[in-house]
Amino acid sequence: MPEATEHPPIGEAQTEPAQSGCPMVIKPPVEGGSNRDWWPNAVNLKMLQKDPEVIDPIDEGYDYREAVQTLDVDQLARDFDELCTNSQDWWPADFGHYGPLFIRMSWHAAGTYRVQDGRGGAGKGMQRFAPLNSWPDNVSLDKARRLLWPLKKKYGKKLSWSDLIVYAGNRAMENMGFKTAGFAFGRPDYWEPEEDVYWGAEHEWLGSQDRYAGANGDRTKLENPLGASHMGLIYVNPEGPEGNPDPIAAAIDIRETFGRMAMNDVETAALIVGGHTFGKTHGATDIVNGPEPEAAPLEQMGLGWSNPGVGIDTVSSGLEVTWTHTPTKWDNSFLEILYGNEWELFKSPAGANQWRPKDNGWADSVPMAQGTGKTHPAMLTTDLSMRMDPIYGEITRRWLDHPEELAEEYAKAWFKLLHRDMGPVQRYLGPLVPTQTWLWQDIVPAGKPLSDADVATLKGAIADSGLTVQQLVSTAWKAASSFRISDMRGGANGGRIRLQPQLGWESNEPDELAQVISKLEEIQGSSGIDVSFADLVVLGGNVGIETAAKAAGFDIEVPFSSGRGDATQEQTDVEAFSYLEPKADGFRNYVGKGLNLPAEYQLIDQANLLNLSAPQMTVLIGGLRALGITHGDSKLGVLTDTPGQLTNDYFVNLTDMGVKWAPAPADDGTYVGTDRDTGEVKYTASRVDLLFGSNSQLRALAEVYAEDDSRDKFVKDFVAAWVNVMDADRYDIGKGA
């Protein structure tokens, strides 16, 4: 079969069956077969199917964010505390307490988040579904969720699985004596696996060869946007890189993978030290587990990894480590033991590399998970990294003498771990939400709503400013299209397009952008109206569209929701925002350097992150091209003789059989459209543009907007899609995507 990195030209990818040296196996649709068996390189438009109501079994009109606010949180805590110590014979609690198991469940749910594309995290309850429910790093978490079923059953639609999975770990730590920073409810459940997350190219669990391909041994060259060192792990191999028990080398993997989860060195050390204060790992025997949940027999009812060992004989990771003598209590014993011993390598009963104190140190100090026996403490290779790595070592040595600092840092890092993918604080619900805020939350001060008279005055000032349609629309698009639905970051609210790093992004054309910002700030200062820069940018885009529509014969008013606020540079985490920089923007025919996928694939991913459907993506492309909204004022894809007018010319000319398309002589990935009769060059276009004429589904959409009776529909649909993008981040007024 073709390699995942092969990207034939659009036409070839869609008209040639896949070639291979082995017979192709085509399965019926109910077994997972699809057109992609024949054309594996075709763009995946299913990512843009935005109709969750079809698969949502909850009644129409149900709003989880309203329902969860009726939850009796105090009673939930009491019920949870009782559950934690009510050991079940079918899965006995280690040390008589399920708390450590629930902490691992919560951590592994939230820890899939990666900052590069904002995907992963706990916010949709994806740990219930494949592939996460069957990752080797999640062995036995199926039992943790099943243990929680009585609580989910009791509280029903008032408590989502998404919230319960992460609440459980948070409350478990409180139950064991730790003071957390708080907790926010508000994560609605999804009802099917996310199909838009790339977890890696490897086809075997714990594989890593593809994600480090071409790295030449440099463990910091992990493929983007991946956040784990191996397929099926949350972060790193606890035995060390590729199983090599080297704590210094393991620290490199730790720093890289936790950094991709937006954690710095202090936060990383706090999470590892704090999290491993509780519980144990499981590798008590050499029994081999049965198949994971997705491959398990029907009679196992959704549980996987079956084996005869439970309780003291449990096998999950194969590592048999109990870190402290108080595994169900918050204290500083992890660091006391880590620094109070020298360590020697040995094998777990399951054959995994782990560490124990030399000279039989701390013998018989650690309780057995079941019964009354005692054993010695043990550590993972990655635990020793917290002492032996110079940076982590400096941090943790201080905590050894100042445990109150560890508690504070762990509380903050744990809260960040659980909430990093929740988006703005306006989405935080419930009585446990902390009043304190942090830089990583992208705080936006509240804005002031504008009156209709104020809006009219400002629109007049913008129209008279000398700024062109292209400048106004392009600037609004650059601001708003930084939004991504994956972790609900970015967008126009906050006015951060005038701040670093967005002000300097190549994709934002800094010199041109600075001129527009200067003019808009002049209007802001001279208008006498208390208007935010963020509102002014979006309003400017609307003025540009209304002007372009009028030039095309349409008298329209683009809906506008005021009240955006302006953030300051001090409220902006430059490093964290740098991950929002678009490497490509197909809506403006911008392609940056070093992309690992052709532009058409990047477009689909961008549209998905903007929470657009395929029709919305299509009409936005056509409208922006008609307005001449391109990077660098390029004519690429501007398939009209009247740029700046909101017409459907783009689709008319794209579907015109009088135009013949061919690769440009420069072989630069662009195409030339010539008159089929005269050979005269009429247009130039990109791979993105030709996608809408060559892909059968997108051509069907393009034809709708090219039809003679669709001019009104085109304008109406373009405006609606535009407003969706402009308001995608408006969680402050309940309009967010």
From Swiss-Prot:
Reported modifications of this chain: Formation of the three residue Trp-Tyr-Met cross-link is important for the catalase, but not the peroxidase activity of the enzyme.
A GO MF term: heme binding
CC annotations in GO: cytosol
Expression induction: By the polycyclic aromatic hydrocarbon pyrene.
Swiss-Prot/TrEMBL site (Transition state stabilizer) positions: R104
PROSITE patterns per the UniProt record, alphabetical: PEROXIDASE_1 (PS00435), PEROXIDASE_2 (PS00436)
Family matches, as InterPro entries: Catalase_peroxidase, Haem_peroxidase, Haem_peroxidase_sf, Peroxidases_AS, Peroxidases_heam-ligand_BS
Co-factor(s): heme b
Keyword Cytoplasm: no
Textual note on the cofactor: Binds 1 heme b (iron(II)-protoporphyrin IX) group per dimer.
GO BP, one annotated term: hydrogen peroxide catabolic process
Keywords tagged on the record: Heme, Hydrogen peroxide, Iron, Metal-binding, Oxidoreductase, Peroxidase
Gene3D superfamilies cross-referenced by the UniProt entry: 1.10.520.10, Peroxidase, domain 2
Coiled coil: none
Cross-link annotation Tryptophyl-tyrosyl-methioninium (Trp-Tyr) (with M-261), location: W107-Y235
A Pfam family per the record: peroxidase
Enzyme class: oxidoreductase
Enzyme Commission designation: 1.11.1.21
Function: Bifunctional enzyme with both catalase and broad-spectrum peroxidase activity. May play a role in polycyclic aromatic hydrocarbon (PAH) metabolism.
UniProt subunit comment: Homodimer or homotetramer.
Protein name from the UniProt record: Catalase-peroxidase
Organism, scientific name: Mycolicibacterium vanbaalenii (Mycobacterium vanbaalenii)
Encoding gene per record: katG
